[in-house]
Each structure stands twice: as C-alpha cells, then as structure tokens.
Amino acid sequence: MQTALVILDGWGLGDHDRRNAVQTASTPTFDRLIEKGANGTLDVSGRQVGLPAGQMGNSEVGHLNIGAGQVVKQAYTRVEDAIDNGSFQTNAAINAAFNHAVATNGRVHFMGLLSDGGVHSEQEHLHALIELAGDRNIDAITHVFTDGRDTNPHSSEQYLTTLEEVIHTHGTGDIATVSGRYYAMDRDKNWTRTRMSYDAIVNRTAEHTTSTALEAVSESYDRGDTDEFIEPTLIDNTPAVEDGDAVFVFNFRPDRVRQLVRMLADIDPAWSFETDPPTTELATMAQYDETFSLPVAFPPNEQHDTLGEVIATAGLTQLRIAESEKYAHVTYFLNGGREIAFEDERREIIKSPDVSTYDQQPSMSSNEVTDTAIEQINTTDPDVLILNYANPDMVGHTGDFTAAIEAIESVDTQLDRLLETIYAAGGHVIVTADHGNADNMGTAANPHTAHTTNPVPIVYTRPDGNGDGDTIRDGGSLCDIAPTVLELLSVEQPAAMTGSSLIE
C-alpha cells in the first residue's frame, strides 16, 4: 500500500464555547496524529470551494473539490449568477417546463427544499421561478420540503411566510403539500418515506390535511416534530400533479432528491405503483443522475483528470470505502459526477444503521467500515485507500451534543485500528475533513444542526507514524489534497489540477 486518504466527515475546528463535540470528546488517536504528524488547517467554505462568499461547505462540494484538484464552481453559484445576469429567464430547461404547461393548459409544479441553508437549495431560486411563472401568467403550484437540518429546526415558518408573500405578489405558486426532508429527501433507500411524499404530491393521500402551510408546520410542532420530520401534509383545495402538467425540481444538489425523482419519472422502480405515475414534463435544476434522461437547467461542468482518473491512468489500484450515507461522496462526487468506477477502482459500501436518526446509534457503521478496510488492505493491498467516516456529520445533524461526542470518540477508536493496519502495510496517511459540523452543536435550548464555516484539520504522517521534517503550508484548501496525494504516489499532476501539494 502506498497512500491512504481518510476523510472525517463533519470534523471541524471551532471555538469551545459552542458545545464543541470535537474538542470535548476524548480523542487520543487524533491527538497523537497532531503531536507526531505534519499538520495544519484548510479553508473549506465560500469561494475556497466554489460557493458564494460566507456560504458553509458541505459533503458534495467538499468531495468534488478534493477529487478535482481545483476549485469547482458549484451549481449554487451558477444559478445565482444566472439570476443576476438575466440568463435564468431564458434557460432552456426551465422554459421547456413552462411551455409544456402552456401548451397543455396544465400547471407547473415546483418542488424542493424551502431553505436558505444553501446546501441543497436556496429559497430565492424558488422565488425567481415563481416570479417568472407570474410574468407569463402560468398556473404554478409549490410542494414544499422543510429543512431543519441545514437550518434551525424551528425555522420553516419564516421561510413559508416569505414564500406566501412572494406568491401573493406574483399571483401564482400556491402551496399544495408540505413534507419534511426526512421523507421527501431520503437517500438511503428508505422507499417507504419517499413514497409518503410521493403519495401526497401525486395521489393526494396523506395522514394530515390543513388549511394552510403554516398550519401544517404549527400542528407538526404540536406533535413534537421539528422541520426535518414534518409528516407529508396536504393543503386544502389544492391540486395534485396530473397528466399534462410540468414539474420542476429546484434543488441544485442531487443526492437527496434522486429517490423522489425516480418515483416521479418511473425510472428503474424499486417499488410497485397502485396507479401509474402521471405523464408530465419533468425537469430539474441540476443533473441528479447521469442515467436520467431529463432536461437539466444547469448541467454539470465536466471534470477531467480527477484524482481517481489520474490514479487509474497511472496503472494503480484504488479502494473506496464508506457507509451508505456517504457512499456517493467517495465515489460519484469524488469522481467529478461520474457514476461508473475507473479501471481498478474497487468500491465497498457498508449499510448505515436502520434507525430513524443517528443519535440513536452514534457509532453508526464505523466499526464495520474499519473491519472492511482492514480486511481489504490485508488481502488485496490497494495502492490507494480513500475512506470516509460519516459519524461527525450525520450525528452532528441531530443536534444531540452527547451523541455527537460519542460519535467523535467512536471514529477516533476506529481510526486507531485503521492507522495501525495502514502503517503495517507501508502506507503514507493524510487525515482531513470536508467541512465542519460537530464542532458547533449550539446550545441545549437551541441546538445547531447545520454545517459550520470553520476550518478543518489536515495531518500527514509517513509509514512510521511521524511527520518529522515535513510541514503543511498555510493557505491550503480542499483542492490541494489531490496534488498532495499524487506527490506521495510520485504521479505527475495534470494541468487540469490547479491546486498544489500541501507538504513542504
């Protein structure tokens, strides 16, 4: 084995006065890495990762930048720019949906995450769509997915109030359904959850019905459910998606709307329908899957000479390991949006625990991830290992401080086992993170469930577990990781990678 890249998802470096689970937890393995290795910090938010200034990073953005070896301009930024320069109004995919609704005398249905979190969506993009529909006298309907994960758990009322003002101003866009993202945006093949949102949107069947969207939220709060967990709710006197309608899904991040879009488009169904899905013109803000034959408003900028491709071209073997919650990140996103593995790229997916929220099992599948990595290193001896530990991020999102501490300590324990095996196999190690999360858990009264804009650690050690004589340069970001890995592999950095090695 030559080199391992270990990504501690959501392990940021922040102040200790915000219930910082990373600093509070006992982390002897990580502390030893910092003591013996060459270490520094990376900026992982805003323009450093291709996002608007001040915007927190996330796992998709982080892994795209890591794999590309360059700052990747994100779909969020591209949509913002299009709205600002007016090209949003002439976008082909958006206009195809609008024109279809006009031609069939149907409606256009907007659906996506109503949030200003900037991770999966931005509420102002929906506002721009409603304004455009109003200008063209198109009957628009909105299906709201509430956040509470990348935003405050009780913040959706303010977003709905603003949305209703936009709807009133432009005379279109009535809200037909409200679903928490736990249901509408599941990504771990919990099809029953996805089906509940689908049934509300298409079949107008749900456990709850209210007169207004705000009532849907307030009644959910009364039941003890925060924004993320609002059960799909129908709003009185509003329509379903029907034959001849158009649908536009406005999330710009793909992984958490794929399942619902698969249902709406009847793509390779892993379920059975009681009735056929309606025949619609379905378009999406970004490309959710390269196998979907759907109009895309902002298709991906193709990434070439990514880390995985360069490793494969050099004739080296690589192993990608994560549990299912982060599997797409160490494969699809790290490969620049490519679904298919490169030559000699082996992938191991470990099923994440079947629990409703990960504070119920903070260790998640970190032990199994480590077991698999150790077995594969000892039996197949890959040249490169890329592994993601999901716990700090996924448990951090629950807002449970005690559980987050347990998650951090679990990862630290597993990291010790993993490092021992890598060093024994002769491997160099880079340990880093893609963004912060567990480094700020808010307060007991007001838990913080979102990512942070804090820097993340970067640590390098040689096979002897030390980094003596090496230093990590200042001013680094995630785009510098791939050049660093290639330097350790003695593989030439391609021109497409504009980052530079972090090791001095």
Curated annotation (Swiss-Prot):
One of its GO terms (molecular function) is phosphoglycerate mutase activity. The active site is at S59 (phosphoserine intermediate). One of its GO terms (cellular component) is cytoplasm. It catalyses: (2R)-2-phosphoglycerate = (2R)-3-phosphoglycerate. It comes from the Archaea. Its cofactor is Mn(2+). Substrate binds at H120, R149, D150, R181, R187, R253, P254, D255, R256, K326. Catalyzes the interconversion of 2-phosphoglycerate and 3-phosphoglycerate. This is 2,3-bisphosphoglycerate-independent phosphoglycerate mutase. It comes from Haloquadratum walsbyi (strain DSM 16790 / HBSQ001). The gene is gpmI.
